[in-house]
Amino acid sequence: VRLASLIAVVLVYLANDIAAQQLEPLNVSYASVTGSRIPLWIAKDAGLFEKYGLHVNLIVIAAGNAAIGALASGDVEILGAPGTTTMVSAAKGLPFAIIGTFGPADWKLAAHPSIRSIQELRGKTVGISRPGTTIEFATKRALVKLGFTPGKDINILATGLAESNKRLMVMYQGKIDATLVSPDNLFEAEQKNLKLSLLADLKELGIYTSASDLSARRDFLKSQRRRARGFLMAYCEAIWLGKANKSAALASFRKQMRENDPARLETLYKNYVIDALPLKPYPMEEVIQTDIENLTSTVPELRGKRAADFIDKTIFLELEQEGFFKTMSNTYAK
């Protein structure tokens, strides 16, 4: 009996080891630990990457040169970062393509409570994350819409902080006077009885951005098609699972963001799963086109370019034709 039990244990171990060896490795980076990353976390926690034959290593690399360098070198195969950085890099010759989105962002321009009107922002300092990021472009576009010339009427300070909640704390420390924040940042500030002034809603200003995007090297998409498809299938199923199974999404928020406050979790779920995530996370072509138009004056390589030049939708189109999204609907429809 003991021998039989030992053999059984060994066989189970070997089976698991063989299964693990059959999974293909994939390195995926994302820029910051924010609620918008929830599809990656659900896919990881629910075993969806393994379902589609992948052993995925999730890595945090701040948006900017480090992230672009990691994608260019092949250290990561999938990059979760603002599409503007990918687009600019591609325009300058790197073989990158935007392949998906984390959904639209809902940015607000918030200021220190001592600043009570938009005009009082003149001569002050607005904090961004890093140069060349979506936050910088969106901030500057908002300031122009509000009648300011960035760099002249208002100082722009790169804080180096991709997380908007951390930039908000820098604002309360007096190092900056305003920054872009998300709805859950506002909720958190309210919970802590921290006052602030809401100066503008970027959507109301007609400024639309993505929360972040998914990008890959074009040669990877061709030569490693199975891995690229597996990733996007797991990513998409995570979205469907998160919308249909609230408890699964909340479990990932708790684990990855170390958040246990019920009210905060509800806010995260509403803002980043229900309101933001599209069931078919195609690249946001209109947003990318707007970025091109706004960046052409500072990035001459973008002149004459269209959003389609920086997008690869072929895997999603294949999945559509194969009935993948119909299967998701049949599986997760309530």
Please name every model-derived segment.
Residues 21-183, 198-208:
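Short, glycine-/small- and polar/acidic-enriched structural segments
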Residues 4-17:
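Bacterial N-terminal signal peptides
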Residues 222-304:
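Secondary-structure end/capping motifs
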Residues 134-152, 233-266, 311, 318-319, ...:
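Ligand-binding clefts/hinges and TM-proximal coupling segments of bilobed small-molecule sensing domains
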Residues 293-334:
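Conserved C-terminal helix/tail region of periplasmic/extracytoplasmic solute-binding proteins
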Residues 57, 65, 155-158, 267-273, ...:
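Short linear loop/turn motifs
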Residues 84-85, 163-258:
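Pocket-lining segment of extracytoplasmic ligand-binding domains
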